[in-house]
Regions:
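Conserved ABC ATPase "signature" region
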Residues: 12-30, 139-140
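Conserved ABC ATPase signature
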Residues: 35-39, 43
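Hydrophobic anchor residue at the start of the ABC signature
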Residues: 49, 77
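A short, surface-exposed alpha-helical micro-motif characterized by mixed small hydrophobic
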Residues: 102-104
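ABC ATPase "signature
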Residues: 120-121
Length: 161
């Protein structure tokens, strides 16, 4: 609860801050009285983001924040996180297996294998000039929406074998 972060906050002030938090993530104050089972997965995630931002953190940790969401709401949440990161000058640790999302959101990437860091660096460098074989294999396994590029990747893989 908010009073653990702001013990001197009045109920009215807390109510206003909560409403502002919901509005910031694109929800209305109508959501205040709803139970989790009355919300969609995307709405639950938006409420979770609003709650995480209430104490005005300098660091936001997002662990698979969009992995279980439909593509349409996933894009909205990604855009929201990018906006929040920029507007609030927030440091964000974004944990994900979806490399397309990682590439869109992250400035720096850490690649882990069996719980150990195998490579790290600026996102574009890691994605386009991986230094470790594990990272290169991981990136080459990502499906490419363009069938011609997917075919090129397949040919390169089979020629390397």
């Amino acid at each position: 609860p908010l009073d653990s972060f702001f013990p001197s906050m009045t109920k009215e002030s807390a109510q206003k801050d909560i409403e502002d938090g919901l509005i910031e993530v694109g929800l209305t104050s109508d959501y205040l009285g709803r139970y989790p089972h009355e919300l969609s997965g995307g709405q639950c995630q938006l409420v979770a983001i609003a709650r995480a931002l209430m104490p005005k953190p300098q660091l936001l940790i997002c662990d698979e924040a969009v992995s279980a969401l439909d593509a349409s709401i996933r894009g909205e949440i990604i855009d929201l996180l990018l906006r929040i990161k920029s507007e609030k000058k927030l440091t964000m640790i974004f944990i994900a297996h979806d490399l397309a999302v990682v590439r869109k959101i992250c400035d720096r990437v850490i690649v882990m294998q069996s719980g150990k860091i195998v490579e790290q660096g600026p996102t574009e460098k890691v994605f386009f000039e991986p230094e470790k074989e594990y990272t290169a294999n991981l990136l080459s396994a990502v499906p490419v929406p363009d069938p011609r590029k997917e075919k090129e990747k397949y040919i390169q893989r089979t020629q390397a074998e």
